[in-house]
Curated annotation (Swiss-Prot):
Positions bearing Hydroxyproline: 70, 73, 95, 98, 102, 120, 123, 127
Gene this chain is encoded by: CEP10
Post-translational modification: The mature small signaling peptide is generated by proteolytic processing of the longer precursor.
Record family assignment: Belongs to the C-terminally encoded plant signaling peptide (CEP) family.
Record bears the keyword Flavoprotein: no
Signal peptide: 1-19
GO BP term, pick one: regulation of leaf morphogenesis
Protein name (record): Precursor of CEP10
């Protein structure tokens, strides 16, 4: 018990000491935020790039398709090549009759009858537990 308390206190002390060290990052420097810029609802960012306005709206789906050049001739849809997104609204609501909705909360009853599905096998030919 005493060893456990020593280990816990030591690990907490080490975590407090190393919590004050410099934070290192890889790849690119992060943008310094002096004020609450990350709570600004008027701007949409994709890796700190301001998106183009289409129909006076900032929208992630409305970004320009030609922002990335393909690496090989042809139509690549791989890394760095955004898919073409159809921005049209489609009304896909399909009403159903009451009582015939197999969605959430509705159980689909197939058959309420009891069937005896026991099928006896010959001794030695049982593929159950502990049988190869």
């Amino acid at each position: 018990m005493k060893l456990f308390i020593i280990i816990v206190v030591t690990s907490l002390t080490i975590s407090k000491v190393f919590d004050k060290t410099l934070v290192t990052i890889e790849a690119r420097n992060l943008r310094k935020m002096d004020r609450h810029e990350h709570f600004n609802a008027n701007e949409d960012f994709v890796e700190a790039k301001m998106l183009k306005k289409i129909d006076n709206k900032n929208n992630l789906n409305n970004r320009c398709i030609n922002d990335f050049a393909p690496t090989n001739p042809g139509h690549n849809s791989g890394i760095g090549h955004p898919k073409v997104i159809n921005n049209k609204f489609t009304k896909d609501f399909a009403p159903t009759n009451p009582g015939h909705s197999p969605g959430i909360g509705h159980l689909r009853v197939v058959n309420n009858k009891f069937t005896n599905d026991f099928a006896p096998t010959n001794p030695g030919n049982s593929p159950g537990i502990r049988h190869p």
